[in-house]
Amino acid sequence: MPIDLLTRRAALMSLGAFASVGLAGCNATPTAGVQPGATPPPGLRIGVVNIDNSPLVAYVGNPTAQWAQQALPGALAQAFGARMAPGDPGAVPLDIRLDTLYLGNGGPADPDRMRGVATLGGHSISVRADSTYIANPTDQALPEQALQGRVQALAVAFAYRLKRKLGA
């Protein structure tokens, strides 16, 4: 009898561990922040980030446009790191207008896409970002979190694409 009990306990513990690991992947991705004591490298310094998502609201509606607006500042902080200087009076403001966001059907044949225009120091830069989505079994159970994760991945791709275009 103790052998059967141990086997049941082991089965229940492994099932519980498997369920918790599966649900842990559904947590929202933490946004990156700028370290307060970080000294910016010489050159480009970005001050205030203004995001205009009104064209995106008209294109895809809420909550998708709101997710993009919320995810982009953290993605920019992750991509630009110490070049973000929100309190620096000499830093240049970055204005971003998000125009379109398309969530594809998945895979490399139909990637997710985000397009917008970034204005930095009076110069406008057209930015296009792509992100490949691979379906996950938990996406069917938690579709809203899956869509939000895809928008966050697009925001990160957008930020790094902007960084590449700026040469920073």
Annotate each PLM feature.
Residues 22-43:
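Bacterial Sec signal peptide processing site at the extreme N-terminus
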Residues 82-126, 132-145:
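Surface-exposed short loop/turn segments
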Residues 27-29, 54-56, 89-91, 109, ...:
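Intrinsically disordered, low-complexity proline-rich regions
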Residues 57-62, 66, 124-165:
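Short secondary-structure boundary motifs at beta->alpha junctions and helix caps
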Residues 77, 81, 85, 103, ...:
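Sec-exported extracytoplasmic/periplasmic mature domains
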Residues 2-25:
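N-terminal secretory signal peptides and thylakoid transit peptides that target proteins
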Residues 40-97:
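N-terminal segment of the mature soluble domain
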Residues 38, 156, 168:
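Surface-exposed interaction regions that form or flank ligand-binding interfaces
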